[in-house]
Amino acid sequence: MLTSGVSMIFSTLNKNWIVDDTPHLFEGVIDDPSKFATWKEVEHCLNFPCFYDIQFIHKVKSGTFDIPKYPRAWARDSEDPEELFNIWKEGHGLIINNFDRGFKEKQKILGEVEKAFHGVTAMHVYAGLMETQSFHIHEDFTSNFIVQVEGETLWDSV
């Protein structure tokens, strides 16, 4: 599922991925980025928030904010889908953590990444409908493999 270009790049990087956190930028190595996320799948997550960890980044303040959760009879407390869509339409940036839940094809992709990097992975989606703010530059505790499906973000390599 990962392209031969990605496999080739991984094999040429002679590094210890566990301790070497030097960032790398590889452009054009994914044949079809829509394998990673589609708008239809994002809409599915917003319609079924009880299965995902959904957050929004404020369109001006560049930080997340609380969204009311409501009790459900057979699932964990979760947000009202209509409210999520309204927040989304207002232009706030969307975060869907654990996007791979419920999507077998995403889990297969993660399996390939886990084989290449010898680690446990998860898939998250960051999206915006219009010009939205992302979060401030920061360092994550975990390593990240970022695939930009569409849009424009300036990425710098070191």
Which residue ranges define each predicted feature?
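Active-site region of the double-stranded beta-helix
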Residues: 2-18, 31-35, 43-44, 48-50, ...
